Design a protein with these regions (language model features):
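Long, low-complexity or tandemly repetitive, helically biased scaffold regions used
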Residues: 1-76
Length: 76
């Protein structure tokens, strides 16, 4: 792989890492929100939806980690 393509791939890795950090921040905020839902609402629809959102964000973070690793392997 030539230097130009490696440089382009590294730029993509940098962008993915930035997106991952942003997602992790949102995930943390959503988890804090979920953890502070009053006990009498914890069995409700809102709490269930919040749990689904947290799981989806976690999956998205993992996917970005996988993508970043794959691209970094290609660069080597």
């Amino acid at each position: 792989m030539n230097r130009e393509r490696r440089k382009a791939l590294q730029a993509i890795v940098d962008q993915l890492e930035t997106l991952q950090m942003q997602l992790e921040e949102i995930q943390t905020e959503e988890e804090e929100y979920r953890d502070n839902i009053p006990e009498n609402f914890q069995s409700g629809e809102r709490c269930e939806r919040t749990e689904e959102i947290c799981e989806s964000l976690s999956d998205a973070v993992s996917s970005l980690e996988d993508a970043t690793s794959s691209i970094e392997e290609a660069i080597e």
